[in-house]
Curated annotation (Swiss-Prot):
This protein binds specifically to 23S rRNA. Part of the 50S ribosomal subunit. Gene3D superfamilies: Ribosomal protein L22/L17. GO terms for biological process: translation. It comes from the Eukaryota. This is Large ribosomal subunit protein uL22c.
Length: 139
């Protein structure tokens, strides 16, 4: 948890999640710069396996913000979300005639930073979606 006098930033980190970074980034890109409630709705409706650990992480960060600092969950938004590569688990797959093929099982580290929306005046939300991306909250 990072505390500044201007705006508190609540950080939650999940390490060694047994998933490739590519699959986790596909989900993280959808919730970046969204409000806490929008992020929860998006994650509950997306059909990917990466949604569950990210949903747990965002919920944990919001609970920490509410309990430790006393922030309202309705005013929080995801100011930073990133996925980095973790350690690679190396295994061996038995093959014919006593051979063994190497198997690499990737892991990733997920970082979520929540911030209070009322105190962050310098955030500019994009009005038009990027070309080729699906927009969840069209009005």
């Amino acid at each position: 948890m990072e505390k500044n006098s201007s705006s508190p930033k609540i950080r939650a980190l999940a390490k060694h999640i047994r998933m490739s970074t590519h699959r986790a980034r596909r989900v993280i890109d959808q919730v970046r710069n969204r409000s806490y409630e929008q992020a929860l709705m998006i994650l509950e409706l997306m059909p990917y396996r990466a949604c569950y650990p990210i949903l747990q992480l965002i919920s944990s960060a919001a609970a920490n913000a509410n309990h430790n600092i006393g922030l309202n969950k309705a005013n929080l938004f995801v100011s930073r979300a990133e996925v980095n590569e973790g350690a690679i688990l190396k295994r061996s797959q038995p093959r014919a005639q006593g051979r063994g093929y190497p198997i690499q099982k990737p892991t990733c580290h997920i970082t979520i930073v929540l911030e209070e929306r009322s105190r962050s005046n310098n955030l500019i939300m994009p009005t038009e979606p990027k070309k080729g991306k699906y927009v969840w909250d069209r009005k």
